[in-house]
UniProtKB/Swiss-Prot annotation:
Organism: Herminiimonas arsenicoxydans
Subunit architecture: Homohexamer.
Signal peptide: none
GO biological process: ubiquinone biosynthetic process
TM annotation in the entry: none
Binding residue positions for Mn(2+): 172, 238
Name the record gives this protein: 3-octaprenyl-4-hydroxybenzoate carboxy-lyase
Gene name per UniProt: ubiD
Catalytic residues in the record: 294
Amino acid sequence: MKYSDLRDFISQLQQMGELKRINMPVSPYLEMTEICDRTLRAEGPALLFENPTGHTIPVLGNLFGTPQRVALGMGATDVSELRKIGHVLAMLKEPEPPKGFKDMLGLGSLVKSLWDMTPKERRDAPCHDIVWEGNDVDLARLPIQHCWPGDIAPLITWGLVITKGPHKKRQNLGIYRQQVIGRNKVIMRWLAQRGGALDFREHSIANRGQPYPIAVALGADPATILGAVTPVPDSLSEYQFAGLLRGSRTELVKAIGSELRVPASAEIVLEGHIYPDESHPSGYEHALEGPYGDHTGYYNEQDTFPVFTIDRITMRRDPIYHSTYTGKPPDEPAILGVALNEVFIPLLQKQFSEILDFYLPPEGCSYRMAVVQMKKAYPGHAKRVMFGVWSFLRQFMYTKFIIVVDEDVNIRDWKEVIWAITTRVDPTRDTTLVDNTPIDYLDFASPVSGLGSKMGIDATNKWPGETDREWGTTITMTPEVKKRVDQIWQELGI
């Protein structure tokens, strides 16, 4: 299914019984978090809070609270179809010469589809229906959630941050949380390795002393939102990929105060700059961010990040504010990880044909632990796969633990994974520790902020060269006996 904008998606979710409208007044301060958390854990619907306490703008929560709704947002009808998207991305990342006429036609069709999905720029747009400028710019007028009791301030969570580096042809889309610190100021928390931070760093070197323009889109269409969290090849625009998911070109409009292009159908757009401040070593305004409850289930440490000053807020008529919360798994990021896991698999298999399956357990905070099922071919093969996964996609840079198992182990069943670890692993021989690697800043378990270690666990059967002992043989029943018992099972009355 395809959706022209967020409102179209909401309408179709409601028809499918996947969205619940809440008419009762509910406060953005803590109450929405508790309601959304209970609903997500029950695999319930998306929630549209129509009367947030103290505000007239409705709040949309739990939008991607089930893998099925993530799949719907990506234009699929079921989670199983997401692997097709992964196959497309794998081909775009590393295209192969066509093996025959049929392959050539297929490749040509995909290239044409991508060309046809070049974003379309409009002269006017719904997101410019209403414009707040000057003293009218006041974030307190938006129903921004205060998610947890220990959070320092309200937090913008689902903002699609749009940036552009001075030497890049295309814009970057990323989702970074933003702490409200004033009527027109937020702290832009982006890690140094993320696209937005890299764009800003390039600007601060090339154009030091010049304000850095940013736009933040709230309530874009689902394909554009999900395109921003998908491992799109660097050569492909997230807007272009969103068009491919949607089946129609992404419509953009020029921001009023900069050259950035924003989604024309976005519900709300924040426009502004990171302004110079020579009192900070970077030459730009910074502030201390946090603490906030995050996807680890803990409150994180404070750290310093750039301040984004909002010069204007534009919006559609009767806008909808899209929000979420992060907390101990499962939360929305964990659910997104479950769905995007299916997109990752073809990408990994394209690079490492020995990988049969790949799983990011949601309990592992979306990406901190990965389990890999492989077809082992030689001694030490599992270690090659570990380092391959760590280095292949940016998404796995922060994966702390990788467990590798053989093809006879179902990696989505923890009972089988634990059985493999406890019967096939010698802790000294089969664990690989790597020091001083990039780690999520939110991971307070690391000895240094942003830098820590990783562990690989080889839970495969060991081959000659890996052990001098005779390796155990797995116990299995004969096929003949299984078939016989299948035939008489009903008669046994068990």
